[in-house]
């Protein structure tokens, strides 16, 4: 018993851990979305971080230093000349311009051709600009010569690395999984390793092609030559600025000199008098010396870094970054591919590592490499085989696995080595995802119950519009024809007391097809066939309860005028009020009980003359709409709610509700019998 409980707990833990690992390792549809987004936002980097640092140190920094010198010369005068006090303004400006052009120190007692020149101070900013342009030539040559080939190589490599991972995770893993399952639960670790090793020997054409490609790149050195030539050229070109700046820094220390302007203009004409000498000073010499020293140190440091990087790349480096992880997905990286370190594989490995953002399965490859000591050599296949062995599920996020529990009906004293293990497997339940816009869980709703409740709800009275003249003229004619046909059918057969329930049922089913104002309806659900409602009283029925002449007199209602009497065999064409609908439980002016009994006497139930039928039932007794009330259907035996409605909702009994009220006089028009 204890052994079974521990096994069940281990299985649950394995399923939970396998779910997390599967989400991490298996490629999914999110890879395609991430890859499409990365293709839009990222581009291939054709320059390594080390190369960018070298370009900044040899090109951008000297340009920045030159900018400082030009800014200082623009902000203040490049030369100061101390002219005598008797010089005018124009003479002082001329002396300053002449001395800035000559820049020769007029030493006394020395021939003029031997005077030292200070022209290097003026030329240094332009020399720094020229050196920066020269140092950019290697980077420009690499971009033009190697960018096209390097781009094609990287596109193929990055895509093929992802394909190798997907083929290993989705292609070969199911084969190993089936072979392990075919061995049964008694498979040993040695047999599992043999299955994995045999699967390693089977290679797809794509894997063979990729291995051949890596072998060819390991034997070629085109990119390696270009990369080496770039950095060697930087080393050679940096010798020129270093030599010039060292010479300038060592020799050009003087910032003050004497400028010879020539003979005095006040002297006699044609006589060689003493020359006028002016003391001058260059304020930017100290700044230029600092810039020269910084540039010398920077260039020397860049050269040292380049040398160290080249030695490490082509002599001492043993790792190839991403290529060292390919053996985990079935690609054998053979050491004999690289006859020497001076090959394209080293260069491509550095650029692949720089463009690792384009490798969608990089995180999974890193996981496999970091956890390889905890699992078998082929982590992807072994892990997927274990996951598939525990449960077959095509959905990567929702599992429908059954949970093994101990059967409560077994005897705990029974030994564990029985024929069948006392384990009951719960039925598997498929979890179905219901898409919804609301992130919160939706409560379960029963559609049948909802329909019943909605049908049993009482409707609110709707406002009735006032009828126009057209409705008043057309509605009675349409309704009169329908009522005459119904009455004719009812009076053609047996018109005994048993004909009252069919009339009530017919009224119930035709109540929704009225052309007039709809009555207030309790529910739209049809009554069951076994529950037949009792018939309405004859005094309340709209099918047969028409007011006769005697009843009208008994109620005190005004009869039709005498001038309408001489209209034999003719209907009233246009009544003053519209007819009531042919269906609906309305309260009409109820006559006394005696008149109702008289109307149901055998003498009155005989077959009437067709002319009398047409003259009596041509139009409905016209009542004003203010007399419409809802009938008490439960008391009168009319249609009621089904019997199972009380289980869902308790509905209060209907009340007499006034639909609409108008202050117009009530008029009742009836036919005249002849």
From Swiss-Prot:
Main localization category: membrane
InterPro entries: Innexin, Pannexin
Example of a GO cellular component annotation carried by this entry: endoplasmic reticulum membrane
Coiled coil (residue ranges): none
PROSITE patterns: PANNEXIN
Region ranges (Disordered): 394-426, 485-510
Molecular-function annotations in GO: gap junction channel activity; protein-containing complex binding; structural molecule activity; wide pore channel activity
Annotated localization: Cell membrane; Golgi apparatus membrane; Endoplasmic reticulum membrane
Transmembrane segments: 54-74, 126-146, 231-251, 296-316
Extracellular compartment residues: 75-125, 252-295
Glycosylation sites: 86
Residue intervals on the Cytoplasmic side: 11-53, 147-230, 317-674
Membrane topology note: Multi-pass membrane protein
Tissue: Expressed in the eye, thyroid, prostate, kidney and liver. Abundantly expressed in the CNS, including hippocampus, olfactory bulb, cortex, cerebellum. Not detected in the white matter.
Stretches with biased composition (Polar residues): 394-408
Domain of life per record: Eukaryota
UniProt keywords, alphabetically: Cell membrane, Endoplasmic reticulum, Glycoprotein, Golgi apparatus, Ion channel, Ion transport, Membrane, Phosphoprotein, Transmembrane, Transmembrane helix, Transport
Phosphoserine carried by residues: 590, 601
Subunit structure and binding partners: Forms PANX1/PANX2-heteromeric intercellular channels on coexpression in paired Xenopus oocytes. Does not form homomeric channels.
Family recorded in the similarity comment: Belongs to the pannexin family.
Role according to the record: Structural component of the gap junctions and the hemichannels.
Name this protein carries in UniProt: Pannexin-2
Gene name of this polypeptide: Panx2
């Amino acid at each position: 018993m204890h052994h079974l409980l521990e096994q069940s707990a281990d299985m649950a833990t394995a399923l939970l851990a396998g779910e997390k690992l599967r989400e991490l390792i298996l490629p999914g549809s999110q890879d395609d979305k991430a890859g499409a987004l990365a293709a839009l936002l990222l581009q291939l980097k054709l320059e390594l971080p080390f190369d960018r640092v070298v370009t900044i140190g040899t090109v951008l920094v000297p340009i920045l230093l030159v900018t400082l010198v030009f800014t200082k010369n623009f902000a203040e005068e490049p030369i100061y000349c101390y002219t005598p006090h008797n010089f005018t303004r124009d003479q002082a400006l001329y002396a300053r311009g002449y001395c800035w052009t000559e820049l020769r120190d007029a030493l006394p007692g020395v021939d003029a051709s031997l005077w030292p020149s200070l022209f290097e101070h003026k030329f240094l900013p332009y020399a720094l600009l020229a050196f920066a342009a020269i140092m950019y030539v290697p980077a420009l040559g690499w971009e033009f010569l190697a960018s096209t080939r390097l781009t094609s190589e990287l596109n193929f490599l990055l895509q093929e690395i992802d394909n190798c991972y997907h083929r290993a995770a989705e292609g070969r893993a199911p084969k190993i999984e089936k072979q392990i399952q075919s061995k049964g639960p008694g498979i040993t670790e040695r047999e599992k390793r043999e299955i994995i090793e045999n699967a390693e020997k089977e290679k797809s054409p794509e894997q063979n092609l990729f291995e051949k490609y890596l072998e060819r790149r390991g034997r070629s050195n085109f990119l390696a030559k270009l990369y080496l030539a770039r950095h060697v050229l930087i080393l050679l070109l940096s010798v020129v600025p270093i030599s010039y700046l060292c010479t300038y820094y060592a020799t050009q220390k003087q910032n003050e000199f004497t400028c010879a302007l020539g003979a005095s203009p006040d002297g006699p004409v044609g006589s060689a008098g003493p020359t006028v000498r002016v003391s001058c000073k260059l304020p930017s010499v100290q700044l230029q010396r600092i810039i020269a020293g910084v540039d010398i140190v920077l260039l020397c440091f860049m050269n040292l870094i380049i040398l160290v990087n080249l030695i490490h790349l082509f002599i001492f480096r043993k790792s190839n970054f991403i290529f060292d992880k390919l053996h985990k997905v079935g690609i054998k990286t053979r050491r004999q591919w690289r006859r020497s370190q001076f090959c394209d594989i080293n260069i491509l490995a550095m650029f692949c590592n720089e463009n690792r953002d384009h490798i969608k399965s990089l995180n999974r490859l890193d996981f496999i490499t970091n956890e390889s000591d905890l699992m078998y050599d082929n982590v992807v296949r072994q892990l997927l085989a274990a996951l598939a062995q525990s449960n077959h599920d095509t959905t990567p996020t929702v599992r429908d696995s059954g949970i093994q529990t101990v059967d409560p009906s077994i005897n705990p004293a029974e030994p564990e080595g029985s024929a069948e293990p006392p384990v009951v497997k719960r039925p598997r339940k498929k979890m179905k995802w219901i898409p919804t816009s609301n992130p919160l869980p939706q409560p379960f709703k029963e559609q049948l119950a909802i329909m019943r409740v909605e049908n049993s709800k009482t409707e609110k009275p709707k406002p009735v519009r006032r009828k126009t003249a057209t409705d008043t003229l057309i509605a009675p004619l349409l309704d009169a024809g329908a009522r005459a046909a119904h009455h004719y059918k009812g009076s053609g057969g047996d018109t005994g007391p048993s004909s009252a329930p069919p009339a009530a049922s017919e009224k119930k089913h035709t109540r929704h097809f009225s052309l007039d104002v709809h009555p207030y309806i309790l529910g739209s659900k049809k009554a069951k066939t076994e529950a037949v409602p009792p018939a309405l009283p004859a005094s309340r029925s709209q099918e047969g309860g028409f007011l006769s002449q005697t009843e009208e007199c008994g109620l005190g209602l005004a009869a039709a005028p005498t001038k309408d009497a001489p209209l034999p065999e003719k209907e009233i064409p246009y009544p003053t009020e519209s007819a009531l609908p042919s269906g609906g439980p309305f309260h009409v002016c109820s006559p006394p009980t005696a008149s109702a009994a008289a109307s149901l006497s055998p003498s009155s139930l005989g077959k009437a003359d067709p002319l009398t039928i047409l003259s009596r039932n041509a139009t409905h007794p016209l009542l004003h709409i203010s007399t419409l009330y809802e009938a008490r259907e439960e008391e009168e035996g009319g249609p009621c709610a089904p019997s199972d409605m009380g289980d869902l909702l308790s509905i209060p009994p209907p009340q007499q509700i006034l639909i609409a009220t108008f202050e117009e006089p009530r008029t009742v028009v009836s036919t005249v019998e002849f």
